[in-house]
């Protein structure tokens, strides 16, 4: 199978806790924190590991929080290729409120990357073998301009590395401007921004996705449609997969789980239909969990079997 790598420029060490209720000024008693790796590409690599595959996570790691992050990934059998960073890896906080069932996500700025640290990450990427898949996901940290990221994607493509970009806004537009991106996964609102018009009907969404494929910007576009599942388009096919009704607990890990599952199928040279089905299954499986947990292998396989009937 084709080897998979992920790139996360702004990784995080995520801590989750529970408190009975939230109110201002007073001390809020919380449960002991649970620590998990965080960051777009890292979570994609974790989802792939949960599903029985393997992806090497490339990222900067700094300070004690960076060491803790690397240790947690080792516990999940996720191979890593890290660059030592001067600034400590950021730490995010997720709080679940028992009384209301609400979740609060406190997201810190990514640790700044200097030019030398980015250059080392670039070297890690350009050592990837031709034909391998690289998933670029997550936000840009301070010190890294969008131009640097697009130059890295272009350089990787010239070496035969197949790039998947899971981003939004200017970063997604800039990546598509390079062209020949293996896969993008915008939601309907993001797709509307990409084609610069409102998309109100299902056929509008399909046509917009096909425009991006036909223009050569991306080989595959999978539009996330929330409860309506996802619409997948390539040069020859168009398919919509609607998930079964499930008791959703949290949507936090759904997107990264979906990208991980689709990447795994892409590495297996599966059809567009199989890829979208497996992605929707993993995304739905992730919503069964509370907090920030990703998809599980068993839940994903059960939903995938249901969708494949």
Curated annotation (Swiss-Prot):
Catalytic activity as recorded in UniProt: beta-D-fructose 6-phosphate + ATP = beta-D-fructose 1,6-bisphosphate + ADP + H(+)
Binding-site residues, Mg(2+): 190
Chain residues that bind K(+): 250, 252, 286, 289, 291, 293
Effect of residue 190 to Q: Causes a 50-fold decrease in the kcat value and a 15-fold increment in the apparent KM for ATP
Pathway recorded for this protein: Carbohydrate degradation; glycolysis; D-glyceraldehyde 3-phosphate and glycerone phosphate from D-glucose: step 3/4
EC number: 2.7.1.11
Regulation of activity: Allosterically inhibited by ATP. Allosteric ATP-binding requires the presence of the substrate ATP. Inhibited by monovalent cations with ionic radii larger than Na(+) (e.g. K(+), Cs(+)). The monovalent cations increase the affinity of the allosteric site for ATP. PFK-2 is sensitive to inhibition by fructose 1,6-diphosphate.
One Pfam family, short name: PfkB
Binding site for ATP 1: 27, 185-187, 224-229, 248, 280, 284
InterPro entries assigned: Carboh/pur_kinase_PfkB_CS (IPR002173), PfkB_dom (IPR011611), Ribokinase-like (IPR029056), Tagatose/fructose_Pkinase (IPR017583)
Catalytic class of the enzyme: transferase
GO BP term (any one): glycolytic process
GO molecular function annotation: 6-phosphofructokinase activity; ATP binding; identical protein binding; magnesium ion binding; protein homodimerization activity; tagatose-6-phosphate kinase activity
Keywords from the UniProt entry: ATP-binding, Glycolysis, Kinase, Magnesium, Metal-binding, Nucleotide-binding, Potassium, Transferase
Binding site for ATP 2: 27, 187-189
Annotated residues for binding of substrate: 12-14, 27-29, 39-43, 90-92, 139, 256
GO annotations of cellular component type: cytosol
Cofactor(s) recorded in Swiss-Prot or TrEMBL: Mg(2+)
Family of the protein in this entry: Belongs to the carbohydrate kinase PfkB family.
Assembly and oligomerization: Homodimer.
Note: Only 10% of the activity present in the wild-type strain is phosphofructokinase-2. This enzyme is not to be confused with 6-phosphofructo-2-kinase which is also called phosphofructokinase 2.
Function: Catalyzes the phosphorylation of D-fructose 6-phosphate to fructose 1,6-bisphosphate by ATP, the first committing step of glycolysis.
Protein name: ATP-dependent 6-phosphofructokinase isozyme 2
Annotated source species: Escherichia coli (strain K12)
Source species taxonomy: Bacteria, Pseudomonadati, Pseudomonadota, Gammaproteobacteria, Enterobacterales
